[in-house]
Amino acid sequence: VIDFYSNPDNRYSVPTQCGWEEIVTVKPFGNLIAKFDTGNARYSVLHAENIKVNGKKITFTNNNKTITTKVIGEYTSITGGGKDERYLVDLDFEFANTNYGKITFGLDNRDDFNTDVLLNRKTMRMLNVMVNPQRKYVITTKFESE
């Protein structure tokens, strides 16, 4: 038992507390406000407008920046508002000055929400954070989004 736990690969590190709202960086869009959602979302979601698909490429706009990238899949999101078809893309992601490489986002128009990004539990496990539902901006500051 001691040998097993003496190997750092066999230990879980204690998650860092974060607020339910923090600033993240999604390249090439820059710093965006994200909701850390402990619900059942299958994928993290990124706000997208003017979505146009041409074969295996997708063009969309976020934060007045338009990009074209590869579609890696599609899925049906079932929410309180009904069913919604969403495209999946991989984008570079940073949080708290750490680059996590590419993560998968579903694209959706989030105009009716206060945040451009919704992070699911899978992404939060990768970030090794636990959400304090009483707090916002524990790790980052809202000023980073301006």
Model-derived features with residue positions:
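Pepsin/retropepsin-fold aspartyl endopeptidases
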Residues: 2-146
